[in-house]
């Protein structure tokens, strides 16, 4: 067997015994096939295995050719935000709910993984969003999102008054609970629940979805991925404001801050089995009607 990968990382934070068992089986399977295996240190102690290599997620990104994420999309998003900083490919075994980003079925994962490790795969690059919050004193907070950047109030059902500019041109003003700015990857997540369109994963676009707008004419807007979105607040907003990245990183705001969202230079490098079909994934996960 030709080795396309020499060092493989196992990552993910298992919540269930079934997921933990998959970690153990995967480690044993890879070691028996002669791979150098590094387990994420946050999960290594739960496995209770002897003589294992473990390290931080960042060091797995530096040292490994491939990372296998065991879990659902939440685990994938958490790992991918860090791993996207490094030259590493990522594939997932689904131990969550929907699993849009975790291709491998746990029942057939090892056969699928054998084929992938034998070279039967293709690579798909998914772009990330970068959000930059410029404070009144000139300092900036910067973070990234794979699915979406969300502007929202700190409390439920609080209206926010703001303006949206695209490439320095005024686009629209908004009075709503917030705004979702989504990648194609995120278009099947929170964006979809808010009434946004599904964007094919390879599309170079992002979508802006108002959250509970106080108007009947507000609709989602699809723009080019090279666009820069600028959010400007109505002064003296008394509500607590926040920016959320993939619902995992929360950044505090005030009405004097300026928000810029654009395509990041980072990419998520996903590995897919050769028989992967995006539309089959949509049909399966969203329970679309089958062919006649």
From Swiss-Prot:
Superkingdom, natural source: Bacteria
Catalytic activity field: NAD(+) + ATP = ADP + NADP(+) + H(+)
Q: Which cofactor does it need?
A: a divalent metal cation
> Recorded E.C. number(s)?
2.7.1.23
One GO biological process this protein is involved in is: NADP biosynthetic process
Q: Where does NAD(+) bind?
A: 73-74, 147-148, 158, 175, 177, 188-193, 248
- Which UniProt keywords are present, listed alphabetically? ATP-binding, Cytoplasm, Kinase, NAD, NADP, Nucleotide-binding, Transferase
Sorted alphabetically, which HAMAP family does this protein's record hold?
A: NAD_kinase
Put simply, this protein is called NAD kinase
């Amino acid at each position: 067997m030709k080795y396309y990968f020499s060092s493989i990382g196992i990552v993910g934070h298992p919540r269930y015994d079934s997921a933990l068992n998959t970690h153990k089986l995967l480690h044993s399977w890879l070691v028996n096939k002669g791979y150098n295996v590094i387990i994420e240190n946050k999960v290594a102690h739960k496995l209770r295995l002897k003589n294992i290599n473990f390290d931080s997620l960042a060091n797995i990104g530096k040292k490994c050719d491939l990372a296998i994420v065991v879990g659902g999309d939440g685990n994938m998003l958490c790992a991918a935000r860090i791993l996207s900083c490094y030259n590493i490919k990522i594939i997932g075994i689904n131990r969550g709910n929907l699993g849009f980003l975790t291709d491998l079925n746990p029942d057939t994962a090892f056969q699928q993984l054998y084929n992938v490790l034998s070279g039967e795969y293709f690579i798909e690059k998914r772009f990330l969003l970068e959000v930059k919050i410029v404070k009144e004193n000139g300092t900036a907070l910067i973070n990234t999102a794979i699915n979406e950047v969300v502007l929202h109030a700190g409390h439920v059902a609080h209206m926010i008054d703001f303006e949206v500019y695209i490439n320095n041109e005024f686009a629209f003003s908004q009075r709503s609970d917030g705004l979702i700015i989504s990648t194609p990857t995120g278009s099947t997540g929170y964006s979809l629940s808010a009434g946004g369109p599904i964007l094919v994963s390879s599309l170079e676009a992002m979508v802006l979805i108002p959250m509970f707008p106080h108007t009947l004419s507000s609709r989602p807007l699809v723009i080019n991925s090279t666009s820069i979105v600028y959010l400007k607040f109505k002064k003296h907003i008394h509500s607590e404001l926040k920016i959320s990245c993939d619902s995992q990183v929360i950044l505090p705001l005030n009405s004097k801050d300026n928000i810029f969202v654009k395509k990041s230079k980072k990419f998520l490098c996903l590995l897919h089995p050769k028989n992967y079909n995006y539309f089959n994934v949509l049909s399966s996960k969203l329970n679309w009607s089958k062919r006649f």
